[in-house]
From Swiss-Prot:
Segments for region (Interaction with YY1): 641-685
Compositionally biased intervals (Polar residues): 427-436, 479-523
Species the sequence originates in: Mus musculus (Mouse)
Annotated GO MF terms: chromatin binding; chromatin DNA binding; cysteine-type deubiquitinase activity; histone H2A deubiquitinase activity
Higher taxonomy: Eukaryota, Metazoa, Chordata, Craniata, Vertebrata
Span of the annotated motif Non-classical PY-nuclear localization signal (PY-NLS): 716-723
PROSITE patterns, per database record: UCH_DOMAIN, ULD
Gene of this entry: Bap1
Region (Disordered) residue spans: 273-333, 372-436, 463-523, 574-623, 702-728
Protein name per the record: Ubiquitin carboxyl-terminal hydrolase BAP1
Subunit annotation: Core component of the polycomb repressive deubiquitinase (PR-DUB) complex, at least composed of BAP1, one of ASXL1, ASXL2 or (probably) ASXL3, and one of MBD5 or MBD6. The PR-DUB core associates with a number of accessory proteins, including FOXK1, FOXK2, KDM1B, HCFC1, YY1 and OGT; KDM1B specifically associates with ASXL2 PR-DUB complexes. The BAP1 deubiquitinase activity is not required for PR-DUB assembly.
Length: 728
């Protein structure tokens, strides 16, 4: 039983794979880099690695020291999972089991569930024997250890091999029944550190206890001693991101439905024009080369005829009223004119035909790079160049739908989301507040297509795509990566060094390249598109049009949105009839440290949407009715969150792959390669020279520097002369 267990390294990737080999689902291990910062998210337990002190190096004996913090009550000790370590080199598995088997809401799998049920009520010593007699645990443990050398160095008689090297030990910090316990398999009793404060989490107290322990061991030195290492057992972030993505995609569909419903109420004539437009699609699909230049100008005439009389094409969009959207569908199509053409003259060449993508990809530019947008702007593709009118002041309570309808999506590449006028030439303006309305009859068609794509996106299993396609029109996960901020090579960095959710010193390449982080240019580009570039105008528009984002943004990824028949959009308040527990139950489980409040809320709202029975028990909170501009701002917020979680999920998947690569490098046996390489050197006649060179270098390096500068004193001892044979 006590033979064959190998020593494991303190690596979060190794522990994560070990958890999977145990059969546990939904759990991973992260490394803690900073004890001063608060832990984000739920934590099941801490695994602390420290250097084993001299008088306790014998790993085969359990320490019998007892102090005031030791729990000697057999009922308390036997009801928790606390096992004595009776096997050398098994402290890593003991520490991991001490965390997992003391959590009530973790899917342990068949192996650990059987272990927990079998050892229920056992003494710590009996539980230690149970671990030693579990071949599944030993096999999983040794599968992630480095191979032992074939020939061990000769041992001195009476000296243990453990004493010849530095020994490190793992212990666990776990919250049980509202109190923080330290579970050390080499101690006879668990250590009770007491309860934590009402206004703090159990992790805060655990960090204080660990910092005090490190401070005592290092005699007050800074708390970054390399002899210590701390890891946290946390929920699997892949499940969290997948659940968030599901909720966000459902909410995206709800926002699109609300936007479509609002347009149907405010612009009922668009439904009729949409039907007539579909009947005239064959006429519009004719090649543009068959039309004369006069025919191209005729397509623009109805738009300009209803505007205020102007002298040139540069003032067309300056004062168009809302009635421009009521023009017949056959004449409302705008065509991009070459820069050299004029309104009254015939262009020298026909207008170029712009290759159009599908409707949802053509204008759904939330994830489009701003550099690409500027290139299109410089090339004259998709935007017209007309002077800007100064923005007009308006009151806070007026509902100017002429200004708010500007951001509705359109299939025409010549009309995109226009930013508000800031006094600079080159941007479009409206008669209401300096913007061109893009609410055209084919807006309903675009929203219908997006609703269909959103429904398809919900029905398809979640997968990570590195390029935008028909299945995910709005999500473009970046494939490029930036190097780590520290001078390191990604091929040599372990996956645990690349990034961690707990204040990692190295940043993930995918997160560094994520375009939807708060400081990214895409987020600022979206805000510029919505609210303009002027700071004062930005503040005013944030108050006016960012109301939906301010109200629903905090819960957009954790709760479902409810759309009423009257267009009121509100979050759902889940009752206790759902699968999740009530707040009181949640708080009691939170005292055990393994509740996972954030993840449970997400699971609750997801199941309430998937299951009709749970959906009926959900009650919508008081909501409000938002304008089209506010709904579009909320839609862009949802799209940014989706892109963000797609990138985070892709990062977790890539990190898990690197965990496996590091594990293969760690457990691979290089003896055969080394033997083959040495034999090849011997065949080439190079081995003898290399051995002589290395031996001579070692001899020169082995001379003490102090002896080189030491003055030699004359030897005054009398030396005997060599014996010479007398001649006979």
């Amino acid at each position: 039983m006590n033979k064959g267990w190998l020593e494991l390294e303190s690596d979060p990737g190794l522990f994560t794979l070990l958890v999977e080999d145990f059969g546990v689902k939904g759990v991973q291990v992260e490394e803690i880099y900073d004890l001063q910062s608060k832990c984000q998210g739920p934590v099941y337990g801490f695994i602390f690695l420290f250097k084993w002190i001299e008088e306790r190096r014998s790993r085969r004996k359990v320490s019998t020291l007892v102090d005031d913090t030791s729990v000697i009550d057999d009922d308390i000790v036997n009801n928790m999972f606390f096992a004595h370590q009776l096997i050398p080199n098994s402290c890593a598995t003991h520490a991991l089991l001490s965390v997992l088997l003391n959590c009530s809401n973790v899917d342990l799998g068949p192996t650990l569930s059987r272990m927990k049920d079998f050892t229920k009520g056992f003494s710590p010593e009996s539980k230690g024997y149970a671990i030693g007699n579990a071949p599944e645990l030993a096999k999983a443990h040794n599968s992630h250890a480095r191979p032992e050398p074939r020939h061990l160095p000769e041992k001195q008689n009476g000296l243990s091999a453990v004493r010849t090297m530095e020994a490190f030990h793992f212990v666990s910090y776990v919250p049980i029944t509202g109190r923080l316990f330290e579970l050390d398999g080499l101690k006879v009793y668990p250590i009770d550190h007491g309860p934590w404060g009402e206004d703090e989490e159990w992790t805060d107290k655990a960090r204080r206890v660990i910092m005090e322990r490190i401070g005592l061991a290092t005699a007050g030195e800074p708390y970054h001693d390399i002899r210590f290492n701390l890891m946290a057992v946390v929920p699997d972030r892949r499940i969290k991101y997948e659940t968030r993505l599901h909720v966000l995609k459902v909410n995206r569909q709800t926002v699109l439905e609300a936007l479509q419903q609002l347009i149907r109420v405010t612009q009922p004539e668009l439904i009729q024009t949409h039907k007539s437009q579909e009947s005239q699609l064959p006429e519009e699909s004719k090649p543009a080369s068959s039309k004369s230049p006069l025919g191209l100008e005729a397509g623009r005439t109805p738009v300009a005829s209803e505007c205020t009389q102007t002298d040139g094409a540069e003032e067309v969009a300056g004062s168009c009223p809302q009635t421009t959207t009521h023009s017949p569908p056959s004449k409302c199509k705008l065509v991009v004119k070459p820069p050299g053409s004029s309104l009254n003259g015939v262009p020298p060449n026909p207008a170029p035909i712009v290759q159009r993508l599908p409707a949802f990809l053509d204008n759904h530019n939330y994830a489009k790079s701003p550099m690409q947008e500027e290139e299109d702007l410089a090339a004259g593709v998709g935007r017209s160049r007309v002077p800007v009118r100064a923005p007009q002041q308006y009151s806070e309570d007026e509902d100017d739908y002429e200004d708010e309808d500007e951001d509705v999506q359109n299939t025409n590449p010549a009309i995109r989301y226009k930013r508000k006028g800031t006094g600079k030439p080159g941007s479009l303006s409206n008669s209401s507040d300096g913007q061109l309305s893009v609410l055209q009859p084919n807006t309903i068609n675009v929203l219908t297509e997006k609703l269909q794509e959103s429904q398809k996106d919900l029905s398809v299993p979640l997968s990570i795509k590195t390029s935008s396609g028909a299945g995910s029109p709005a999500v473009a996960v970046p494939t490029h990566s930036q190097p780590s901020p520290t001078p390191s090579n990604e091929s040599t960095d372990t996956a645990s060094e690349i990034g961690s959710a707990f204040n990692s010193p190295l940043r993930s390449p995918i997160r560094s390249a994520n375009p939807t982080r708060p400081s990214s240019p895409v987020t600022s580009h979206i805000s510029k598109v919505l609210f303009g570039e002027d700071d004062s105008l930005l503040r005013v528009d944030c108050i006016r049009y960012n109301r939906a984002v301010r109200d629903l943004g905090p819960v957009i990824s954790t709760g479902l949105l409810h759309l009423a028949e009257d267009g009121v959009l509100s979050p759902l308040a889940l009752t206790e009839g759902g699968k999740g527990s009530s707040p009181s139950t949640r708080s009691s489980q939170g005292s055990q440290g393994s509740s996972g409040l954030e993840e449970k809320e997400v699971v609750e709202v997801t199941e309430s949407r998937d299951k009709p029975g749970l959906n009926r028990s959900s009650e919508p909170l008081s909501g409000e009715k938002y304008s089209p501009k506010e709904l579009l701002a909320l839609l862009k917020c949802v799209e940014a969150e989706i892109a963000n979680y797609e990138a985070c999920l892709k990062e977790e998947v890539e990190k898990r792959k690197k965990f496996k690569i590091d594990d293969q490098r760690r457990t691979h046996n290089y003896d055969e390669f080394i033997c083959t390489f040495i034999s090849m050197l011997a065949q080439e006649g190079m081995l003898a020279n290399l051995v002589e060179q290395n031996i001579s270098v070692r001899r020169r390096q082995g001379v003490s520097i102090g002896r080189l500068h030491k003055q030699r004193k004359p030897d005054r001892r009398k030396r005997s002369r060599p014996y010479k044979a007398k001649r006979q």
